[in-house]
Amino acid sequence: MSNKYDYDLIAIGAGSGGLSVAERAAAYGAKCAVVENGKMGGTCVNVGCVPKKIMWYGANLAHALEDAKDYGFDLENKGFDWNHLVTKREKYISGINNWYHNYLADSNIDELTGFASMVDEHTIDVDGKQFTARHIVVSPGTKPTIPDIKGAEHGISSDGFFALTACPKKVAIVGSGYIAVEVAGVLQA
């Protein structure tokens, strides 16, 4: 690394993209940092793949318990405790977030906490403090889009689904992709 810069590489965003590019560069000896203003792991870990699969697995168990009597099991199904599943899900995700903090430290990747903005092609500002790098990778992730349709203000996004404190009695899901189908299965449990 040249003494001209604080880092060889700074990745803005600690999701799959930012973490993997910093990890690879650090493995080759580059001095790296990752900037994140939220939870480590990005969308997949926090409001995507991981929490959805945990909820999906819980729903599958609920369906299996219901079907068990058809296979000779005499089980009493006392229902599905939404709050218990959400608590377990959040504990699991928190463990992944904490693992990333330790992993970055073990990989000699600095963790810069805050909101990053570009100053110039080699400089970022993180909540009032400036850092320089030979390479800056912008990998900020995304948020779900709420469609511009009448009544959209009454709906929630997939992020909102993971913020639910109770399972709603009635739901209409807009969309038919695999995420929509899996969320429908969870809510039906």
Task: Report residues per predicted region.
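Rossmann-like NAD(P)H-binding beta-loop-alpha module
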Residues: T165-A189
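Conserved acidic residues
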Residues: G15, F115-S117, G177
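Conserved N-terminal Rossmann-fold NAD(P)-binding element of oxidoreductases
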Residues: I12-G13, V35, V138, V174-G175
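Glycine-rich flavin
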Residues: S2-Y7, E23-A30, V35-C167
